[in-house]
Regions:
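Residues lining hydrophobic/aromatic ligand-binding pockets adjacent to catalytic sites
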Residues: 2-251
Length: 251
């Protein structure tokens, strides 16, 4: 099934997670416009301020300290970083310890060190700085905007429609279509004239630093292993299924 809408502008909307895992990175890389969904609530249990990297005895967490005490429910755009340079330096040391023998250690660490050297005070700024640096390293060009730059409200479905229209999108790419936890009525989205595409992601296999293979890690694990070639690896296996097309909705 193909999208036959003439000029396609593919939009993805997703929380700006920390050191995103490979599936999320591929979703952004395959989009024309990525809308960082920074108006949603910050949640500790998500990957907003933590991510997994490879470890000798299994995946290891990297966590970013943020200010939550006394803040209650706060949107991602308002979450402040704490801890000065201590955790930044600790992250870089841990990454060095785990990846110093990787083929592209020097190049990728240089990218990360520059991003970590920034003076960001907000989590969303830091996360988007990292994402932008990794996209640039792999040669991927994507327009990155923030949800808070645009007027949007109502329920989850209405927000998706408004944000997609705000950047003149006619295709919305989702990574959660068909999952048990559906927060969006996709038939309403397609009724608004927007094609809905579902990301069908298969993680590439590559030589990691430790065996056996550890899936679902930050994309930096892939970059340390294969360098800029990661963009081509992901593009070659990329599949976006247009599951709902205006005029042909289905549940």
């Amino acid at each position: 099934m193909t999208v036959s809408q003439g000029c396609v502008t593919r939009i993805s909307v997703h929380q700006p997670n920390f050191l995103p895992w490979t599936k999320f990175f591929d979703k952004v890389a395959g989009s024309d416009v990525y809308i960082a969904y920074d108006s949603v609530q910050y949640t500790r249990s998500e990957f907003h301020s933590r991510q997994l990297i490879a470890g000798r005895n299994g995946p290891v967490w990297l966590s970013v300290p943020v200010l939550t005490r006394g803040r209650g429910r706060q949107p991602l755009c308002a979450v402040e970083l704490v801890g000065g340079r201590v955790w930044r330096d600790a992250h870089l040391r841990l990454l060095t310890e785990h990846y110093r023998h990787a083929p592209y250690f020097g190049a990728v660490m240089a990218v990360l060190e520059e991003a970590y050297a920034g003076d960001d005070t907000l989590l969303v700024d830091f996360n988007l700085r990292l994402l932008g640096a990794l996209l640039a390293y792999t040669g991927v060009t994507v327009r990155v905007v923030r949800a808070t730059w645009f007027d949007h409200g109502g329920d989850n479905t209405e927000r998706i429609i408004q944000l997609t229209r705000a950047v003149s999108g006619n295709v919305h790419l989702t990574s959660t279509y068909g999952t048990p936890r559906r927060y969006v009525d996709w038939n309403r989205v397609v009724a608004a004239g927007i094609t809905v595409e579902s990301q069908q992601f298969t993680e590439p296999l590559y030589r990691q630093q430790f065996e056996p293979f550890q899936p679902n890690l930050s994309v930096v694990d892939l970059l340390f292993a294969v360098g800029p070639a990661a963009a081509g690896m992901l593009s070659a296996r990329r599949k976006f299924d247009p599951v709902l097309t205006p005029g042909f909705p289905r549940s």
